[in-house]
Amino acid sequence: MQRPEEYQKLFKYFDIKDLGINLNIGHLNLASKAFNFSKLKFVDMLKPYITAIELSHNNGIEDQHLPLKRNEWYWKIINDPDFSKVYKILEFRNTNIKKIKEVFKFFKNKQ
């Protein structure tokens, strides 16, 4: 499922207590460009169902699984107080420990 309307149909069949969503930030970036929808409005719609957020950066064209960068659109989601207790999953490929430590500093400093 990639489009907001697909999730709206799903929510008609499942209660919040029966369904948890792992929001993949990289996939969200790709889908929002492919299907022309607002990332932040989409997250607001999913918010009650989000139990985890999978984190990676990409160029909006392909799923690159790059480390997070400063001052990007997704920090508003990551730092949303409603997600303070939601699991954050790092999904970086071919990333050295130095770069991972840098990303952790972003988290400490709220980016």
Where do the language-model regions lie?
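Histidine-acidic metal/acid-base catalytic patches
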Residues: 4-111
